[in-house]
Amino acid sequence: MSFYNNTEVQIKSKGFKVVSKDFERPWGGFLVIDESQAQNFSNQFFKGLDVQTLKIGGKLSPKILIVKPKARLSWQYHHRRAEIWRVFKGECGIIRSDTDKENEMKIYNEGDQIKLKQGERHRLIGLEDYCLVAEIWQHTDKNNPSNEEDIVRVQDDFGR
């Protein structure tokens, strides 16, 4: 069984409903969890953080990111969401900045939590092994929730 399929089985075994998935991203893939399970997702991956405290302008969307070793997501930001991440398997690198200039990468380990503001530039990086990151999208515009197209790629290793 592939690492991706094994991860999906593990997530489902915790009682989560996977509503969509994409294992064909050049950097790895993701699982989208049913939004009605946001609090259960927080209980499992964010130490029970009350999801009501995360709401900025609308709903919350939980996801699992699966990052391949040595792969870099695009240097990017979003117009209609902030994000909160928690590394729950492996370690990963993250670069953050309030401008288009990339800062130095910092390494995050299992259990580390990261809060990204709307518009903050960021890049998630796989290191020596696969990394799993729990992510909650904090939609900032309740009338126009964020989606996979809400991404401004400042730099991308894959020419997207």
Segments (PLM) and residue ranges:
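Short, surface-exposed coil-to-beta transition loops
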Residues: L60, R80, Q118-E120
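Short, surface-exposed beta-strand-loop junctions and turns on beta-sheet-rich folds
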Residues: R81, G93, D100-E102, C131, ...
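Double-stranded beta-helix
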Residues: R123-R160
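Short beta-strand His + acidic residue motifs that chelate non-heme Fe in jelly-roll/DSBH
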Residues: S74-Q76, W85, I94-R96, K115-L116, ...
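Glycine- and acidic-residue-biased ligand/ion/polar-headgroup-sensing regions
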Residues: P69, H79-T99
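Conserved hydrophobic/aromatic beta-strand scaffold that supports enzyme active sites
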Residues: P62-I66, I84, M105, Q113-K115
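A short, N-terminal "cap"/entry segment at the start of jelly-roll beta-barrel domains
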Residues: M1-L60, S74, K106, I151-R160
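Short acidic-glycine-tyrosine-enriched beta hairpin
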Residues: D98-G119
